[in-house]
């Protein structure tokens, strides 16, 4: 394998096919085609209502980027109108898309570990915020244990931010603090997320274990807090140093 000076990773989230911003999507497509990143990560909410039509549009778009991509589901990627399917097989439609266009990324200078923070229902309303389950957390921890001796930085990819926007605020992700601490303790150094539709880049800690939290914005029309459509570019060098560039679409 040739040795390169750095790995370039495009981090996008919340495309929300069905209410996508087509101009912003074209802007992102052009960047992918011109710059040829090593890989893409999409941290959830690929669709707006998880309809077959929206998944078909997502499949066509992601396949057309012609770049290795890791897809993570978001709360919008479970059936909204078909409750039977939502409870019986919530990720069947997402799984078909992931099988068609998704990839397990093997990057030269980083390791990406998926972590699912979605549940089809919960004992609160709305059902949109994250829930950490022991089973899914253990799956991510087991993967980190397998990678323990690999010197490359371990990057978690999930949909929901694991911590609230600021310390002291109520955490909308149930057991997110626990997951943050255990993942950091297991060797993860970065967590990529979406969900909130505005970008951020923070160093946060719990119980003396720190991780860098990097959130991507959205490429949809569902804008929040005055933030324009955006995505992130991560450049990871041979030493594991990660530079993050936030790119905003000019409205």
Tell me what each language-model feature is.
Residues 1-64, 81, 100:
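N-terminal active-site segment of His-dependent metallophosphoesterases
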Residues 2-10, 104-114, 149-153, 205-212:
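Beta-strand-turn-beta hairpins that frame and shape the catalytic cleft
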Residues 11-13, 40-45, 69-75, 116, ...:
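Active-site neighborhood of phospho(di)ester-bond hydrolases with catalytic His/Asp-centered motifs
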Residues 18-20, 48-53, 75-83, 119-126, ...:
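Active-site environment of divalent metal-dependent phosphoester hydrolases
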Residues 56-139, 182-184, 207-209, 233:
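Extended active-site neighborhood of metal-dependent phosphoesterases/phosphodiesterases
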Residues 144-165:
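Short acidic, glycine-rich surface-loop motifs adjacent to enzyme active sites
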Residues 168-239:
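Conserved beta-sheet core of the metallophosphoesterase superfamily
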Residues 236-251:
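A short C-terminal boundary segment appended to hydrolase-like catalytic domains
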């Amino acid at each position: 394998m040739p040795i390169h000076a750095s790995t370039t990773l495009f981090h996008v989230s919340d495309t929300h096919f069905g209410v996508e911003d087509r101009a912003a999507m074209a802007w992102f497509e052009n960047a992918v085609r011109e710059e040829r990143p090593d890989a893409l990560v999409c941290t959830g909410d690929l669709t707006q209502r998880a309809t077959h039509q929206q998944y078909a549009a997502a499949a066509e778009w992601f396949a057309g980027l012609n770049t290795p991509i890791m897809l993570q589901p978001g709360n919008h990627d479970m059936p909204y109108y078909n409750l039977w399917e939502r409870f019986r097989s919530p990720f069947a439609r997402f799984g078909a898309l992931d099988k068609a266009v998704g990839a397990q990324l093997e990057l030269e200078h980083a390791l990406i570990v998926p972590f699912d923070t979605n549940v089809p229902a919960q004992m609160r309303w709305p059902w949109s915020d994250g829930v950490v389950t022991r089973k899914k957390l253990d799956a991510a921890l087991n993967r980190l244990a397998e990678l323990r001796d690999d010197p490359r930085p371990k990057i978690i990819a999930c949909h929901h931010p694991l911590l609230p926007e600021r310390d002291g605020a109520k955490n909308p992700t149930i057991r997110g603090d626990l997951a943050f601490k255990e993942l950091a303790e297991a060797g993860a150094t970065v967590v990529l997320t979406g969900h909130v539709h505005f970008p951020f880049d923070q160093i946060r800690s719990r119980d003396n274990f720190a991780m860098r939290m990097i959130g991507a914005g959205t490429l949809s029309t569902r804008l929040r807090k005055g933030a324009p459509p955006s995505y992130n570019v991560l450049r990871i060098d041979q030493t594991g140093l990660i530079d993050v560039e936030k790119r905003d679409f000019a409205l």
